[in-house]
């Protein structure tokens, strides 16, 4: 089983659909709206959320496989009830699965902002809204954060020279 992950490069998604390679596509969306996404995803300004999801739908139609939407949850940034409702509206008619990923602290983000992980209760509430809206949502288990070895943390340690 092969999975290809992308930040949502629309021409690349369309190329995968045309090539009909049997794989699972994961799209790192992280926000249901363009303003929030462009603030937290460096390439977020290049492709609009609507265009990314349209490409994901084209991929699903061509491949006959659901697309995974990756959504790293950042406290006070992309974890509100309103954002959950908007994401549910955008995905309700699709078979896409949403993987909710708790943020692993790695230092300041691309904008210099320091992000925090939402509480477990906030994450549960977000998932409940998605589920009530007809969207399949799963929590991605995180491991290694107690030793700064979880997703993203090793890269930050190497990049900054921290030991």
Task: Enumerate the language-model features and the residues they cover.
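C-terminal interaction modules of eukaryotic adaptor/scaffold proteins
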Residues: 136
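A structural preference for short, hydrophobic beta-strand core positions in alpha/beta folds
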Residues: 100, 139-141
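Conserved AdoMet/S-adenosylmethionine-binding subsite of the radical SAM
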Residues: 1-133
């Amino acid at each position: 089983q092969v999975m290809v992950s992308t930040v949502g490069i629309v021409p690349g998604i369309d190329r995968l659909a045309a090539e009909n390679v049997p794989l699972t596509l994961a799209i790192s969306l992280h926000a249901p709206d363009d303003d929030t996404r462009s603030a937290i995803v460096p390439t977020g300004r290049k492709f609009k959320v609507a265009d990314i999801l349209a490409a994901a739908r084209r991929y699903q139609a061509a491949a006959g496989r659901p697309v995974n939407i990756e959504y790293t949850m950042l406290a006070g940034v992309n974890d509100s009830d309103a954002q959950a409702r908007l994401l549910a509206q955008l995905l309700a008619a699709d078979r896409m699965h949403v993987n909710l990923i708790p943020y692993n602290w790695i230092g300041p983000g691309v904008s210099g902002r320091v992000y925090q992980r939402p509480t477990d209760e906030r994450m549960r509430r977000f998932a409940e809204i998605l589920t009530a809206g007809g969207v399949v949502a799963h929590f991605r288990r995180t491991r290694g954060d107690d030793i700064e070895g979880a997703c993203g943390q090793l890269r930050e340690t190497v990049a900054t020279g921290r030991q």
